[in-house]
């Protein structure tokens, strides 16, 4: 008899894919170049519709840790993932995408000061809160941190504001930080009425 079927060797080669645009990332300044590899997203050109295949990255790092200079994220160890990944090849093993770093909030908090009317103005002090790990007031430069009040004399009782200042900046972006005033600064300086003979208070 003559067989009406036959078998022969056959192979299916992997379909070549190329990476498309990489989705941009952003983060708040933390003093490092670390980026989130789990957020890596890139379109794959030439994949069969319906197949389960994506690209993933083993690592991610910004090109610079500073707000003003960070504009790119490098992704090493790019590879295919998914149930159908074995049917595809990807020539690229690295990728780049846009990346931005936004300023970190740095809150200037004035220490509460209280005096009796007519007494000399006190020395105003306070602290800066919100530094990235490993950083402190030394990153503010030679200008340092100062606090001041607009009060020029102490004859009128009441609550007054105290403003933190780094150089000339009281509210706005300074390097990697966005300078903000603590809510309590608006009433951080209190002038109490002086007592008069007979237990009365001066107005």
Regions found by a protein language model. Name each.
Residues 1-203:
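Short loop/turn motifs that initiate or flank beta-strands
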């Amino acid at each position: 008899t003559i067989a009406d079927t036959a078998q022969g060797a056959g192979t299916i080669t992997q379909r070549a894919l190329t990476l498309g645009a990489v989705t941009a990332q952003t983060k708040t300044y933390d003093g490092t170049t670390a980026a989130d590899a789990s957020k890596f997203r890139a379109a794959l050109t030439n994949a069969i519709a319906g197949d389960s295949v994506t690209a993933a990255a083993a690592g991610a790092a910004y090109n610079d840790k500073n707000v003003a200079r960070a504009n790119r994220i490098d992704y090493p160890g790019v590879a295919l993932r998914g149930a159908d990944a074995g049917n595809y090849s990807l020539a690229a093993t690295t990728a780049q995408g846009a990346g931005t770093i936004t300023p970190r909030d740095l809150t200037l908090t004035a220490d509460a000061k209280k005096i009796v009317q007519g007494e000399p103005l006190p020395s105003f002090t306070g602290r800066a809160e919100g530094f990235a790990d490993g950083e402190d007031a030394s990153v503010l430069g030679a200008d340092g941190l100062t606090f001041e009040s607009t009060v020029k004399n102490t004859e009128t009782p009441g609550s007054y504001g105290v403003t933190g200042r780094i150089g000339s900046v009281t509210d706005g972006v300074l390097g990697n930080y966005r300078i903000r005033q603590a809510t309590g600064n608006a009433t951080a300086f209190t002038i109490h009425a002086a007592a008069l003979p007979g237990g009365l208070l001066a107005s």
